[in-house]
Amino acid sequence: MQDLRNADTLRLPNGDGAAANDEVKSPFLIGVAGGTASGKSTVCKKIMEQLGQAEMDHTQRQVVSISQDSFYRELTPAEKAKAQKGLFNFDHPDAFNEELMYSTLQNILKGHKVEIPSYDYRTNSLDFENVLVIYPADVVLFEGILVFYFPKIRELFHMKLFVDTDSDTRLARRVPRDINERGRDLDAVLTQYMTFVKPAFEEFCSPTKKFADVIIPRGADNTVAIDLIVHHIGEILATTNSAQHSNTVRVAASSMKRDH
């Protein structure tokens, strides 16, 4: 495990596990874990931006990002009523559909196109009208609070990053986010945080830090760490592109021999 507090070098998995030479595109799968509002999605966004992928047509992207929130299980009417009052624990492992998460990541690793619903935080439900289509890519970022919690899912990752941000900063980010973007009121946000979010982080999320290959203190503010990770991913993409070009040349040469 590497803690990137004052990092100027970075030793990361080299992507050998991702089959660049296979005809089917098997991506390099990166897990990005961390507490609520730690900056996981922002880290993924910055990685995408620096690699020139954010504005690219989604059918052509070499790097894609997926949120674990899309794998919350459907709530019962009683659970939805609790959720509206901030009384449902969305930070507990049982809140997620582990099997769907696992099968979807397996299909992605097999190079299949998959469709993933978005999550509507205002209604606490999956939005199947707004489906994210994930096309085969070279690198896939999968971010969420508990992406390292489930053993069989954790084993799928070629690289594991943990975004480590102090609890005061995370709470300061979560309150305005949940009020402005998710339609919550202050009392509900604070009740949910103290009752569920904080205890669940300490019990389920924080212990998974030990599984990380790299810890990123201060999240997206740690530009040095992000630059090093971007450089490493760039090397993986370059290797993949080189292998694909080599395969194309070999196929072309083979065709020429058959023609003669």
UniProtKB/Swiss-Prot annotation:
Q: What happens when the gene is disrupted?
A: (Microbial infection) After infection with E.chaffeensis, results in reduced bacterial replication rate and increased survival. RNAi-mediated knockdown in the whole organism, in the fat body or hemocytes results in a similar phenotype to the genetic knockout. However, knockdown in the eye, salivary gland or wing has no effect.
Indicate the transmembrane segments per the record. Answer: none
SS bond partners = none
What keywords are annotated for this sequence in UniProt? ATP-binding, Kinase, Nucleotide-binding, Transferase
* Catalyzed reactions per annotation: uridine + ATP = UMP + ADP + H(+); cytidine + ATP = CMP + ADP + H(+)
- One Gene Ontology biological process: UMP salvage
Could you state a single Gene Ontology molecular function term? uridine kinase activity
Q: Does the keyword Methyltransferase apply?
A: no
- Positions binding substrate in this chain are D91, Y119, R174, R184, Q192
**Part of which pathway?**
Pyrimidine metabolism; CTP biosynthesis via salvage pathway; CTP from cytidine: step 1/3; Pyrimidine metabolism; UMP biosynthesis via salvage pathway; UMP from uridine: step 1/1
Q: Where does ATP bind?
A: G34, G35, T36, A37, S38, G39, K40, S41, T42, D221
Kindly state one GO CC term assigned in the UniProt record. cytoplasm
Q: What EC number(s) has UniProt assigned to this enzyme?
A: 2.7.1.48
* Xref: PANTHER family: URIDINE KINASE
- Similarity field: Belongs to the uridine kinase family.
Name the job this protein performs: (Microbial infection) Required for optimal replication of E.chaffeensis in the immune tissues, hemocytes, and fat body.
Protein name according to UniProt? Uridine-cytidine kinase
Species in which this protein is naturally found? Drosophila melanogaster
